[in-house]
Amino acid sequence: MDKALKEVFDYSYRDYILSWYGNLSRDEGQLYHLLLEDFWEIARQLHHRLSHVDVVKVVCNDVVRTLLTHFCDLKAANARHEEQPRPFVLHACLRNSDDEVRFLQTCSRVLVFCLLPSKDVQSLSLRIMLAEILTTKVLKPVVELLSNPDYINQMLLAQLAYREQMNEHHKRAYTYAPSYEDFIKLINSNSDVEFLKQLRYQIVVEIIQATTISSFPQLKRHKGKETAAMKADLLRARNMKRYINQLTVAKKQCEKRIRILGGPAYDQQEDGALDEGEGPQSQKILQFEDILANTFYREHFGMYMERMDKRALISFWESVEHLKNANKNEIPQLVGEIYQNFFVESKEISVEKSLYKEIQQCLVGNKGIEVFYKIQEDVYETLKDRYYPSFIVSDLYEKLLIKEEEKHASQMISNKDEMGPRDEAGEEAVDDGTNQINEQASFAVNKLRELNEKLEYKRQALNSIQNAPKPDKKIVSKLKDEIILIEKERTDLQLHMARTDWWCENLGMWKASITSGEVTEENGEQLPCYFVMVSLQEVGGVETKNWTVPRRLSEFQNLHRKLSECVPSLKKVQLPSLSKLPFKSIDQKFMEKSKNQLNKFLQNLLSDERLCQSEALYAFLSPSPDYLKVIDVQGKKNSFSLSSFLERLPRDFFSHQEEETEEDSDLSDYGDDVDGRKDALAEPCFMLIGEIFELRGMFKWVRRTLIALVQVTFGRTINKQIRDTVSWIFSEQMLVYYINIFRDAFWPNGKLAPPTTIRSKEQSQETKQRAQQKLLENIPDMLQSLVGQQNARHGIIKIFNALQETRANKHLLYALMELLLIELCPELRVHLDQLKAGQV
């Protein structure tokens, strides 16, 4: 950074100061050092102020909303004839040229006052002179240039031509070697710095392009069902992530080799980077999966992570691996330890609130340990994407390879320390066998066993938490309450099972009759309700078991409808119905008549040899809670099987778990998102995309697709990806890149660029047509897939046309300039308010 800034200062001093000052004085050396000292002080002041700017907010919210307002105003001003056009209100400084200059002078004076060294600020004449130079020689010409549609069109053509050229280059970028390892060897053995710099650039371009490529169709996962095409999409996404990782490794190797050969140090502050001359020229690349699977490799990787102060990531991954292979009775203790070590005491593994709630649910036994698998997968991706590329170019990796070679020299590598990859096919076979066994067993017995296990788990968890150094009182209290609920749930299930057994054992011997009825009021509406007594009359006429259930008339009608779907003859049976006349109350006569009709209906059902076996009838007469009963007579026209009744209960029926409202839960590395939403930062971007491409009804779909794309491609929330992208855009490496572009534009090959020639209207018109044609020919496939081909085309034309009006461009530039300068120098706001007040 310092070197790049120094070059710009030297060129500026040579061409803008020394060119005239050298003829007036021979003391240019002293002036150079004085100005250089002031230059560095200005740079420090600028850096200090920029460090207090919330760059993510400015870029993602303020700038994007300014662009959104600009396009909305342009759209309103260009309304169709049948609509009322709205005048496009320009920035206040664009009323006339004098107001424009005054605005720039005000900005320049505040900038000079804020950034000049304290010793120079005292001089009023110096401040005025520098502000005038900044206004007339820098800001005004820059605004005129950037708002000129012809210049914009020329830049568009140049960038598109450059992109086509680079596309041709990168097609040949990886034809140097037949395999990835050979490509790495080629980098490590090459001694041409310029070749390596060009190769590094091509790799960076490839990384940028690769991260934007993904399959948009079928990104959404359907619960419990995946199509072959969906699996292919996920496979492509996984391979793309591996490809990006390989590119990142190649880039690191390229930078290391350039540094060894005396070229620029692209990554000077990389911890653990090899010193010059270290390491073999040809290096073996261990795959990340192999490093984690091998204890010896993982130990060295853990040492590197400790150096990076991220040892907790490896420790968490290892703890979850241990949890996967633990005995059932060890799980509560291990879960408690993981919770205490990583989420309570150190909090080194930061997760979103939704995942944290799942962890607490797992801790108390309401959910399985799958949440830890999910977090482990995200930690795995973080280790692979962020730390693996730098690890394999570190001194610790070099030492690992040396030790590995020594082992090979003395003996064959022992497999005892190897932790082989999990046999997924074997697991699936075991799962299939287990599922078959479970299907053959009685579901009710299995569910009772699950409740007993859950109860035991919660008791162990309670004991583990109570014995912890810092027991969480809320969780302890919650566990005690849940243990009471599970005990009650178990009692209900046992009673339900016993009652079901009685029913099955005595089919055809049950009787049901309505003993009484009453009128209840619900939501201001009168409803008839009946009390049905169900009894079992054994031989000898002695009633041994009975119970009473309240049922509304609507429930009788639902039972009639369900049974009629299976037995069409029941449709002829008429049940009582309420009068549809308004304000007609339910009288005693109706209650008596309906009671008799319903009694007859029940007796007919129970006396029928087939209908008395109906699951729907048993569920209607059973006093068990609704969550213990599932009725599904659809599609079972003439078949009734009470034995399968309990087996068709959903497996999570007895778990009172909080439903998560968010579907895109993932590891945010890392911190909660703004406003508790995973796309809060992207909201203005979504609105801008919707406005430019006129999505209307497609807006929600595009929003979900973008979130899914970022999740699949980068393995993180869109908020996290936006933060990382903005941080990368304004990183030191990219700032150096921008400064070098500025330097090369003003001083190509170290010489001041000649003034541009004035172009004719014909030339400008030809450039405009070529630029529009090129833009339409180069619409990214990703954009067309996202918003549709026609919408993409119309949106590109809208953007292009918006840039063809000089005054509209100036308006946007001044709006953005005011926004950014106020963020940099808040003092400017008062001066601009005074200026606007004086113009009114």
Swiss-Prot record:
Q: Keyword Protein transport, does the record have it?
A: yes
Membrane topology for this entry?
Answer: Peripheral membrane protein
**UniProt key word Protein transport:** yes
Record-linked SUPFAM superfamilies: PX domain, Regulator of G-protein signaling, RGS
Q: Where is the PXA domain?
A: 1-164
**UniProt superkingdom:** Eukaryota
BP-aspect Gene Ontology terms: negative regulation of transforming growth factor beta receptor signaling pathway; protein transport; receptor catabolic process
Recite the UniProt keywords alphabetically.
Coiled coil, Endosome, Membrane, Phosphoprotein, Protein transport, Transport
Write out the annotated subcellular location.
Endosome membrane
Cellular compartments per GO CC: endosome; endosome membrane; intracellular membrane-bounded organelle
Q: Where is the PX domain?
A: 508-628
Any idea where the RGS domain is? Answer: 287-401
Phosphoserine (modified residue): where? S665
Q: What GO molecular function terms would the record report?
A: phosphatidylinositol binding
UniProt xrefs under InterPro entries = Phox_assoc, PX_dom, PX_dom_sf, RGS, RGS_sf, RGS_subdomain_2, SNX25_PX, Sorting_nexin_C
Coiled-coil regions listed in the entry:
434-499
Recorded family membership: Belongs to the sorting nexin family.
Q: Give the function comment from the record.
A: May be involved in several stages of intracellular trafficking.
* Name of the protein: Sorting nexin-25
The organism is Homo sapiens (Human)
